[in-house]
Curated annotation (Swiss-Prot):
The lineage of its organism: Eukaryota, Metazoa, Chordata, Craniata, Vertebrata. This is Collagen alpha-2(I) chain. The keyword Secreted applies. Residues 1-979 are annotated as: Disordered. Expressed in bones.
Amino acid sequence: SGGFDFSFLPQPPQEKAGVGLGPGPMGLMGPRGPPGASGAPGPQGFGARGPAGPPGKAGEDGRPGERGVVGPQGARGFPGTPGLPGFKGIGLDGLKGQPGAPGVKGEPGAPGENGTGARGLPGERGRVGAPGPAGARGSDGSVGPVGPAGPIGSAGPPGFPGAPGPKGEGPVGNTGPSGPAGPRGEQGLPGVSGPVGPPGNPGANGLTGKGAAGLPGVAGAPGLPGPRGIPGPVGASGATGARGLVGEPGPAGSKGESGGKGEPGSAGPQGPPGSSGEEGKRGPNGEAGSTGPTGPPGLRGGPGSRGLPGADGRAGVIGPAGRGASGPAGVRGPSGDTGRPGEPGLMGARGLPGSPGNVGPAGKEGPVGLPGIDGRPGPIGPAGRGEAGNIGFPGPKGPAGDPGKKGHAGLAGNRGAPGPDGNNGAQGPPGLQGVQGGKGEQGPAGPPGFQGLPGPAGTTGEVGKPGERGIPGEFGLPGPAGPRGERGPPGESGAVGPSGAIGSRGPSGPPGPDGNKGEPGVVGAPGTAGPAGSGGPGERGAAGIPGGKGEKGETGLRGEVGTTGRDGARGAPGAVGAPGPAGEAGAAGPAGPAGPRGSPGERGEVGPAGPNGFAGPAGAAGQPGAKGERGTKGPKGENGIVGPTGPVGSAGPAGPNGPAGPAGSRGDGGPPGVTGFPGAAGRTGPPGPSGITGPPGPPGAAGKEGLRGPRGDQGPVGRTGETGAGGPPGFTGEKGPSGEPGTAGPPGTAGPQGLLGAPGILGLPGSRGERGLPGVAGAVGEPGPLGIGPPGARGPSGGDGLPGHKGERGYAGNAGPVGAAGAPGPHGSVGPAGKHGNRGEPGPVGSVGPVGALGPRGPSGPQGIRGDKGEPGDKGPRGLPGLKGHNGLQGLPGLAGQHGDQGSPGPVGPAGPRGPAGPSGPPGKDGRTGHPGAVGPAGIRGSQGSQGPSGPGPPGPPGPPGASGGGYDFGYEGDFYRA
């Protein structure tokens, strides 16, 4: 577990293992995981030693304890320098350090390059009504007047998704006017989309209601979609209103004549069921209900372009893919047959408008899959092109795009307790293991060893199935999710090695390749949504002190890539993000044959610009190539004010964005060219590789020197130094008292001179005292050899002399040569001992006499002056090596390196399957008018529609007559604005 490494403190000698204070906090970490259990400290582990105690008596050197098993722990700091093992003594154990503060939570990796819109907060879930059976398509009726849009209800609680009713397959009729949009309910959980049927002719876009999406009501029978206008610039998103309850669906339009029955599309695959809810049974395909009378048409919005796809935020729960209540429908333009959608590619130039024809019936919608667990939703895949409905509430979602790759993980911090966030998407394969740092040397106070390799990770379990979806917490504004990666295969688990010191975290590996997409599961009946889990996101742990940057570990071996995991359950679609940037236009489909020329509709009122994106060709009838006549409903002259939509039929589908509302009233539009399908948005490329991990920070400060190791064995004794110079001789001992002088005998005659004795050893000079009487002679030295000669006659003894007065003692003279000994006189009697004289000054040193016999050892003299230092003796043999010192304390971890720069975005991946159309973005600013496209072939003249009631807007100025017949393919140069 993270902590500060106090290894730089001085350590007391220890007999026991030091108390380990764990390694310091790492650098910025990802969210703090629950701390691993600490292993029991082994004897003499790496713990920091406390402050040194007083040195104990040197005991035996303790041997360093074994290393304790290190429990899994946060990243370790560098091992400190090993200290020398202290003598075994009684130092106190160091205080246990407090655990370091948890590391700062790492910043999340940069989001994948998703669209940029921020996601609104999803409202509460509304209850989803069960979709009723789809009515049969009505025949083309005249468009009734547009009813006013119903007020947006407040969001109801989310319901469980009903099972989708079967899609009716009546012939395609002309679209009846849509009823007014019910208030928008909350989005229910998304169902799995069925296969996308061939695109219908695009209907005019309804006005976008602001507000949360209502739960889809039961859909009335869809009218034929009118041609899709060229998207106007995307307006800024309106604020998300509260989700409305689902309004009652408007009455269905009257039943149109039957078109030929299209083949029903096969049901789309169901995504794997999420863990929540039991699957309900799929309802039988209902009979197509008859369509009710058409509600009044909504104001005609200019067809909006697809909004830019927003980045996915956290997905709100999307309701079942029932058709939502349509927003008030704009006046329908003539429908062109749509060509079948090509593979979505990049959007090419727009194709010439197809001729309006009947739309084949849409295939059945696939059953709604159970909502998957809410992973982080991947970006919405490119939409399959469904029948374009009026752009009102989103219709059923197309199949989900591939999940984007999971963004790179930030550095893992200590994980906080996981909040009730949804499960993460599948984890990419583990990044390469960081290199194991070299093990620091142990030695006395070596520099800190490099950090050991992380032991092989424990076996990675299979990625668990996503847990049940918790109740979504309040959604924060989700950041844009990176595209969801498919789950990488779990790496093989290595055996768990002993934990080395944990190396710094290696840079995250690149995201693993997307796993294969799992096979669609059997279509389950829609389950009921599980109860929402409670709990908001966990608290962010306190930021730890950033540890020093660890040395960069060596690159670990890359684990084997595990097998691709199954796709996780499909997450509930995220809340609709703000429209992302528009994808590049796909190549236009071939122009369909011109449809019969529809009769010019009345000039609808110019609705407020729908969420249409650019009011491109359908946009402002800026240049209304509109047929003037077609103006409001003039005869279908050239297309009505399709201003810029010259190409869109004569009637620009929308009058100038200006007064004419984004769509001028649609004259009889020549059929607007079918908008080429928007190319699928390319997949967001995988997130660029993580930035390079910044250079490792400087190594942490070296730990302080460890304790001194035990004393090595004593080396052999060196040779004795040379003897120092002798100290001065000790003082001479005091003389004994002199005997009393005997009476002198008469002097004998001098005998012949004896041989000179060897000079006696000089006595030490005595201190100069007063001269005493001469003492008795000291002991006789060994007699010299006898002088030869006959003994002289003994002289008479002299009389006693008077004692001399005590003179000062002179310095001792140098000893004169010894005279020849006189013949010994008779021994006088021993006189009384004289008084002890004071010590005389030392006489000068006489020459050295022969060595006398060893006398008894005198008392030790005072210590002599220290002699000069002798020469060093030879070096003794090397002592035994000392015991190995303890490991030094672990150094603090280095500071975390700076985050590397974000890697450049990876190459754009292949386009994924087209996702469902995103919700229309808010109306963008008007784009610049594009250049007129080439004139398409003339469409067949459509039947004249009856004039709708005048819309509330002022009529647009009549456009100049457009070319008659064919719509122009309108090239589109409008700038895309990011919403």
